[in-house]
Regions:
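Short glycine-aspartate micro-motif
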Residues: 1-2, 54-56, 121-125
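Short glycine-rich, Thr/Ser-proximal phosphate-binding strand/loop in the N-terminal lobe
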Residues: 1-37, 139-168
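Short beta-strand scaffold segments in enzyme catalytic cores
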Residues: 8-12, 61, 130-135
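Glycine-rich phosphate-binding loop and adjoining helix at the ATP-binding site
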Residues: 23, 31-43, 47, 51-55, ...
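Short, structured loop/turn "capping" segments at alpha-beta junctions
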Residues: 97, 116, 132, 141-144, ...
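Hydrophobic, well-structured mid-protein blocks that either form specific transmembrane helices
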Residues: 105-143
Length: 173
């Protein structure tokens, strides 16, 4: 499951091959972006697939041992929430939650262009925010958060470089 600022998406993935087994299912992120409402959407996605078993989840903030350490593009009430426990309780399935860009980076390192690469590998995700999964010689440097770097007149670089900035400024590709 991928938690985003505008949508929460889920799919069943073959962890041996990285292939998506089902069609992606998306539900808009609740406008409050608060824990209880978002956990209910996560449970709806699990139920949509009638899935029973462990669930991996990418989350758009700093996550340490399943606990949210920053609000990212969500509500400030997320800070300090044990996301693993919340999603497990609401869905009835065991969850492992990590930073969303770190999760995308793991996918690239195991199934994509990063597979077998040494040195520095950076996965950049562009959405409501700007994420980064950074690996050195195959080892994750967790919660690197390049999008949080202060930049010029903006609070942080993702305010200038994320897809949300394109929409805010009325830009096109």
């Amino acid at each position: 499951i991928d938690i985003g600022g505008t949508g929460i998406k889920g799919d069943i993935v073959n962890v041996e091959t990285g292939e998506m087994i089902t069609e992606r299912h998306r539900i808009p992120t609740p406008s409050s972006r608060k824990p209880d409402e978002m956990a209910e959407v996560v449970a709806q996605i699990v139920e949509h697939f009638k899935y029973k078993g462990p669930v991996g989840c990418g989350f758009p903030s700093i996550v340490k041992e399943g606990v949210c350490k920053s609000e990212g593009n969500l509500h400030k009430s997320w800070v300090g929430v044990n996301i693993d426990e919340l999603f497990t309780k609401v869905s009835g399935q065991p969850f492992t939650v990590l930073n969303d860009a770190d999760a995308a980076g793991y996918a690239s390192m195991n199934y994509g262009v990063g597979k077998g690469r040494n040195g520095l590998v950076i996965m950049t995700t562009i959405g409501t925010g700007l994420g980064s999964g950074v690996f050195h010689n195959g080892i994750l440097l967790p919660n690197f958060e390049l999008g949080q770097i202060p930049y010029k007149k903006f609070k942080k670089i993702e305010d200038w470089a994320a897809a949300s900035a394109k929409e805010r400024e009325g830009l096109s590709y």
